[in-house]
């Protein structure tokens, strides 16, 4: 039963819709509380338990996969249909990739002019939308050379989407019934089933009882896979990651690397095909132990991607650094990486005990000491599993965001400045939102799923130990946040003050010497000094990290140190708020007995005082703003650093990043100029639409403050006035039906949610327009 049982408020719980019929005509406060509170109680909300929940989650994956396949197919289809891929690969640096065309009967000459500049540089004759996703670079990297091949890929993706939908539908309808029938000695079917096909299937199966029971064991294994952690881990590690990575290494070796050397695996309309043999000796060197053979004869320095000029024959290398012409990682290095990952993960898939006892490790045996019992606890809490999964995927996404620019994997991606920043921005937002979700569901787990076993001491339960030490955890985070905040902001304000009074020479400038030493350990030279490391200075890696072009290890100074500590401040405050909210979800100094009051994730309901302000939801809500601002500081820093590098004005960042007004003036205001001038009464340009989005997103962002600051009293007065005017206007009074909808003030939770959504959406889209306008 949910801790937020609706009977507290006189409502009935619902299982088939977000808003039950009884509540649909009630106050917004009750409706929102009921939904936000009870939707997290998965079992009672949907009326399913145990393995059926796992099965439903598994089945939802098929739908998710189908959506992904269709989404990718749609993007690729439009590239093939009205993109310029075949033109782009002839000159990837100077040609802008087209995502899709635009046909609008309302476009006049002025409307065409808005997109005209883009079309002229993209090779298109119509109005188009430019692609900032990097998908062209990915297609080029993996060996696509024609629109025909893209169309074939689209068809494959669409077939996979259909297959995923059919698999999900089939399992959803028949799986439970078949399991129940196969597990008994007599035919089983639901009495009164309205599905005649299912009933007839059962009757048919009942006639063949001696045949079908042989399928019991595969079905039981199928169901066990959802609940057996070892089996599930082995499958995900080995089959999904291991074999997929190994297969991708095969594609790179047989298709992508030969294509990068002008040897194409083509599929023509008449059916002719050539399959590139990557090595003259095939697998003989592998079995004979001469693995170094595959790394011999690497591409020459004058190699041109996609041609035979300077091409080598190596297929698996460990060169490091980036190619000189594409400014991207060597495909042979990437193939080696995926081969190693595949082998490693397939081996790791045999670590955990699954079907046979005595073979592999049992996770429950590994989790000893303070971690004992964690496996059972995690298996019984979907919110704990989801929190851990979100945290893990968040870290992976963040790492991808960092690598996508510092070690660009796709050819010529580093030359496309807007795409480079857009991909970093994209992955930063996703990673941040996933981490917020991790903390939110950790709070729900502590409220709803965690129980203290009175028979065990606190030391035997890692979660209990964390809760017991939460005062120390919170106070340490608070101390770090205070230290970072006062010192960082103090230095910024000092520098602003002395600069404003005409004495910039008195600024406090602190060199990040420890970070510079770490850079030198990776091969970076320090102000013309000799290398600290023993790495061969002629290696590709050392050449890459000391290039002026690229962003692997950029020179850093006092402005970088201040930005680093400002970002650290934001990260620590965000974590402080989230940790305090999660750890205090069951009880705090202010209200130690929350858990005994039916206290939930959002709050304990309307009409019980200001308890929403001390709930885990409120901490999540507050931390979201710190997350958004911290992410903004991170991206501001990254973007400005990259802009000055690309424009060869690195001195601007070095001088202006040491005080706050420098950030406002030389980064935000200066780079907003192109959008501010996007359109006027005299005409428009190719940034006009982005300028309009810049304005509209600002308005959305500002609307969020109206909800966040005004709170309940303002809305109560406003709605009363609106309702009064409606009732005093005869025509509107006829339209208005108070029995269908009753306007009431927004609750605190509701107003904060609406305000947060406006703030976040406006914030993110405003900066997206800023990126395109300033970087273009």
UniProtKB/Swiss-Prot annotation:
P700 is a chlorophyll a/chlorophyll a' dimer, A0 is one or more chlorophyll a, A1 is one or both phylloquinones and FX is a shared 4Fe-4S iron-sulfur center. It is found in: Plastid, Chloroplast thylakoid membrane. InterPro entries: PSI_PsaA/B, PSI_PsaA/B_CS, PSI_PsaA/B_sf. Its EC number is 1.97.1.12. [4Fe-4S] cluster binds at residues 603, 612. It comes from the Eukaryota. It catalyses: reduced [plastocyanin] + hnu + oxidized [2Fe-2S]-[ferredoxin] = oxidized [plastocyanin] + reduced [2Fe-2S]-[ferredoxin]. The chain crosses the membrane at residues 57-80, 150-173, 233-257, 334-352, 382-405, 421-447, 472-494, 561-579, 619-640, 687-709, 753-773. GO terms for biological process: photosynthesis. This is Photosystem I P700 chlorophyll a apoprotein A2. The gene is psaB.
């Amino acid at each position: 039963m949910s801790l937020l049982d609706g009977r507290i408020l006189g409502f009935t719980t619902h299982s088939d819709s977000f808003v039950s019929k009884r509540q649909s005509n009630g106050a917004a406060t009750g409706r929102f509380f009921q939904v936000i509170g009870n939707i997290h109680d998965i079992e009672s909300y949907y009326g399913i338990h145990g393995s059926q929940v796992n099965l439903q989650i598994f089945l939802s994956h098929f739908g998710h996969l189908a959506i992904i396949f269709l989404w990718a197919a749609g993007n690729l289809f439009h590239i093939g249909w009205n993109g310029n891929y075949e033109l782009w690969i002839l000159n990837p640096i100077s040609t802008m990739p087209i995502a899709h065309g635009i046909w609008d009967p309302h476009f006049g000459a002025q409307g065409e002019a808005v997109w005209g500049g883009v079309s002229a540089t993209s090779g298109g004759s119509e109005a188009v939308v430019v692609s900032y996703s990097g998908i062209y670079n990915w297609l080029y990297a993996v060996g696509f050379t024609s629109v025909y091949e893209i169309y074939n890929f689209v068809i494959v993706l669409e077939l996979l989407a259909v297959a995923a939908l059919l698999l999900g539908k089939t399992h959803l309808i028949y799986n439970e019934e078949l399991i129940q029938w196969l597990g008994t000695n007599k035919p089983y079917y639901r009495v009164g089933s309205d599905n005649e096909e299912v009933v007839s299937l059962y009757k048919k199966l009942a006639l063949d009882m001696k045949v079908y029971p042989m399928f019991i064991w595969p079905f039981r294994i199928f169901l066990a896979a959802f609940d057996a952690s070892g089996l599930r881990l082995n499958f995900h590690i080995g089959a999904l990651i291991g074999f997929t990575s190994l297969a991708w290494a095969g594609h790179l070796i047989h298709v992508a690397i030969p294509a990068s050397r002008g040897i194409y695996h083509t599929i023509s309309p008449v059916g002719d095909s050539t399959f590139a043999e990557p090595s003259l000796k095939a697998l003989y060197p592998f079995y004979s132990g001469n693995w170094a053979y595959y790394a011999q004869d690497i591409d020459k320095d004058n190699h041109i991607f996609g041609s035979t000029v300077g091409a080598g024959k190596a297929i698996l290398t460990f060169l490091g650094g980036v190619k000189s012409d594409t400014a991207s990682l060597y495909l042979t290095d990437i193939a080696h990486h995926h081969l190693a990952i595949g082998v490693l993960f397939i081996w790791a898939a045999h670590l955990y005990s699954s079907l046979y006892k005595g073979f592999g490790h049992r996770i429950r045996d590994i989790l000893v000491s303070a971690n004992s019992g964690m496996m059972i606890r995690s298996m019984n809490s979907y919110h704990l599993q989801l929190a851990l999964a979100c945290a893990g995927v968040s870290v992976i996404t963040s790492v991808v965001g960092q690598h996508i620019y510092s070690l660009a994997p796709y050819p010529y991606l580093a030359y496309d400045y807007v795409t480079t920043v857009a991909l970093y921005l994209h992955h930063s937002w996703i990673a941040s939102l996933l981490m917020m979700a991790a903390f939110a569901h950790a709070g729900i787990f502590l409220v709803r799923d965690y129980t203290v076993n009175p028979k065990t001491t606190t030391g035997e339960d890692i979660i209990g130990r964390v809760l017991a030490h939460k005062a120390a955890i919170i106070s340490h985070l608070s101390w770090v946040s205070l230290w970072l905040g006062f010192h960082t902001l103090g230095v910024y304000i000092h520098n602003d003050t002395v600069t404003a009074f005409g004495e910039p020479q008195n600024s406090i400038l602190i060199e990040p010497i420890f970070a510079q030493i770490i850079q030198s350990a990776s091969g970076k030279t320090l102000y013309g000094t000799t290398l600290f490391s023993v790495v061969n200075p002629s290696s590709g890696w050392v050449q890459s990290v000391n290039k002026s072009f690229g962003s692997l290890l950029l020179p850093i100074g006092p402005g970088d140190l201040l930005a680093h500590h400002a970002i650290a401040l934001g990260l620590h405050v965000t974590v402080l708020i989230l940790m305090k909210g999660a750890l205090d979800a069951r009880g705090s100094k202010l209200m130690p007995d929350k858990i005994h009051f039916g206290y939930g994730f959002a709050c304990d309901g309307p009409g019980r005082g200001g308890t929403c302000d001390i709930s885990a939801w409120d901490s999540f809500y507050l931390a979201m703003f710190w997350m958004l601002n911290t992410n903004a500081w991170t991206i501001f820093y990254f973007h400005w650093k990259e802009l000055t590098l690309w424009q060869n004005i690195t001195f601007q960042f070095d001088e202006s990043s040491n005080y706050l007004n420098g950030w406002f003036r030389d980064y935000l205001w200066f780079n907003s100029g192109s959008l501010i001038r996007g359109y006027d009464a005299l005409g428009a340009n190719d940034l006009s639409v982005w300028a309009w989005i810049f304005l509209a997103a600002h308005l959305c962002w500002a609307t969020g403050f109206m909800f966040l600051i005004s709170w309940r009293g303002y809305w109560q007065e406003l709605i009363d006035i609106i309702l009064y005017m409606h009732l005093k206007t005869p025509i509107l009074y006829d339209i208005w039906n108070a029995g269908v909808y009753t306007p009431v003030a927004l609750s605190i939770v509701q107003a904060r949610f609406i305000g947060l959504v406006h703030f976040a959406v406006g914030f993110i889209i405003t900066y997206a327009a800023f990126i395109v306008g300033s970087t273009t």
